[in-house]
């Protein structure tokens, strides 16, 4: 069932969203603005209006939507009461929420890339190839030289992960981790406190897709900022990670 926030406004179907962060991210995208530049009071107001409208229409909402509504209401009320001089604790709550939203955005983007690659791989398996095509491989497609694109890094690291943990993945149950990409940034940097060069196996140490995606987001962020450089000299060869020019201890 779809509900409209305003008579001529956008139509929302709560089933289109995977959770409150997904709904918030959609509202941010509509404003076409960076997450950390968003007016949180305005965003909170819009979110709360949607939740109220859904409740008025007697639509069942998962508890996490209501928890987020309570969180936003508290932050909004605190910011309104304190005016320009916002309490440090309120500011921290605001930063935590925006950071969580930014991390969710990264997670969603990576998941979409992985999903796209999965579909492309299925197409390749279904496609009937000629004997000659089986031996053709695009030049340097799987070589990492420290300046590879984000997409190439994702695809290569995903392939290496599946190759390394192929057997264990078949026996591993779906799991939930409380780790965040920020936690994994600290973990990766801890490895560099003890090693000049870190390998793929040292970073991706668990046969879990959830752990892989969370750690991948952390590694890609460090690579994007050129804190780390990622190398692989040949397809399925050792992937090594080294400190980049912008590395911060």
From Swiss-Prot:
Coiled coil: none annotated. It is found in: Cytoplasm. One of its GO terms (cellular component) is cytoplasm. Its main location: cytoplasm. Keywords: Cell cycle, Cell division, Chromosome partition, Cytoplasm. Signal peptide: none annotated. InterPro entries: ScpA, ScpA-like_C. It holds the Pfam family SMC_ScpA. One of its GO terms (biological process) is chromosome segregation. HAMAP family: ScpA (MF_01805). Participates in chromosomal partition during cell division. May act via the formation of a condensin-like complex containing Smc and ScpB that pull DNA away from mid-cell into both cell halves. Component of a cohesin-like complex composed of ScpA, ScpB and the Smc homodimer, in which ScpA and ScpB bind to the head domain of Smc. The presence of the three proteins is required for the association of the complex with DNA. Belongs to the ScpA family. This is Segregation and condensation protein A.
């Amino acid at each position: 069932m779809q509900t409209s926030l305003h008579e001529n406004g956008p139509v929302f179907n709560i089933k289109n969203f995977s959770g409150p962060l997904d709904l918030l991210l959609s509202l941010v995208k509509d404003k076409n603005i960076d997450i950390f530049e968003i007016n949180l009071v305005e965003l909170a107001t819009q979110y709360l209006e949607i939740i109220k409208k859904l409740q008025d229409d007697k639509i069942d909402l998962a508890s996490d939507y209501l928890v987020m509504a309570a969180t936003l209401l508290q932050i909004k009320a605190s910011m309104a009461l304190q005016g320009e001089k916002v309490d440090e604790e309120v500011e921290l709550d605001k930063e935590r929420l925006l950071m969580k939203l930014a991390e969710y955005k990264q997670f969603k983007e990576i998941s979409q890339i992985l999903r796209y690659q999965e579909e492309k791989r299925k197409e390749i398996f279904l496609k009937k190839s000629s004997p000659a095509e089986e031996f053709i491989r695009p030049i340097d497609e799987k070589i990492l030289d420290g300046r590879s694109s984000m997409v190439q890094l994702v695809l290569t690291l995903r392939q290496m992960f599946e190759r390394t943990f192929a057997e264990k993945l078949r026996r591993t149950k779906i799991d939930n981790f409380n780790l965040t990409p920020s936690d994994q940034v600290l973990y990766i940097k801890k490895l560099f406190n003890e090693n000049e060069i870190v390998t793929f196996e040292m970073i991706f140490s668990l046969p879990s897709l959830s752990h892989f995606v969370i750690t991948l987001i952390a590694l890609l962020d460090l690579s994007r900022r050129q804190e780390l450089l990622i190398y692989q000299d040949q397809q399925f060869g050792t992937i090594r990670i080294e400190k980049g020019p912008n590395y911060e201890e």
